[in-house]
Amino acid sequence: MNKGNLIKNYAVALLNNAMVDNIQDKIFEEITSINRIITDNFDIREFLFSPIVNKNDKINAVNLLAKNIKISTIVQNFLLLLVKNSRTAILSNIVNAYNTLLYESKNIKIVQVISANKLQPKEQEWIKSRIEKELNQKTEILFDIDNTIIGGIVIKYDSMLQDYSIKGSLEKIKKALKTVNIAV
C-alpha cells in the first residue's frame, strides 16, 4: 500500500470513530495538540520515531502522555495503534489528512493563500469572500507567507494552483521569451 493511501486510511478510521460520538472537532483539537507536542519536543519525537526503542516503552510513554494531558480514549487508542504498527512517523501527515476530511465532511474547502507579506485582516476577509464567491462554497483559508514570490498572491486548493504573483508572472515572461526566436 502506498504512503498516501495508508495516511488517508488512518485518517478515515479516526474520523469514523469520532463521528460515532459526534466529537470530530474535539478529536481534531486533541490530535493536533499531541502532534504539536511531539513535533516541538525533540526528545519525545526521537523516542517515538526511533526503531531502536522498544514498543512497550513507547506504549508506556503514550499512556503517560495521555494521562498527563487528559486526551480522549479514541485518541489514546489511535496513538497506541500507531505505535504498535510502527507508524508514529506519519502522525503529522495523518493530522493533515484528518483536517482535510473533517472540512470535507462539513462541505468546507481548504484553501491555501500565499503572499509575500503578512496580509491585513481586511485584505484576508476580502480574499476569503472573493474565493468563496468564485467557488460557491464555504472555505477555510490558510494564509502563509513566502517572500520569494515578491508580490501578489498564490492560491492553492485541491489540485488547482492560481498564481497571481510577480514571480509567477516573471517566470511566464521568461518562458515566453525562450520560445520566441529573435533575429539580430
From Swiss-Prot:
This chain belongs to the protein called ATP synthase subunit delta
Q: InterPro entries in the record, alphabetically?
A: ATP_synth_OSCP/delta_N_sf, ATPase_OSCP/dsu
User: What GO cellular component term, any one, is given?
Assistant: proton-transporting ATP synthase complex
Localization per record: Cell membrane
What Gene Ontology molecular-function terms does this entry list? proton-transporting ATP synthase activity, rotational mechanism
Q: Which family does it belong to?
A: Belongs to the ATPase delta chain family.
Record's bilayer topology term: Peripheral membrane protein
Keywords, ordered alphabetically: ATP synthesis, Cell membrane, CF(1), Hydrogen ion transport, Ion transport, Membrane, Transport
Top-level lineage group: Bacteria
Output the lineage of the source organism: Bacteria, Pseudomonadati, Pseudomonadota, Alphaproteobacteria, Rickettsiales
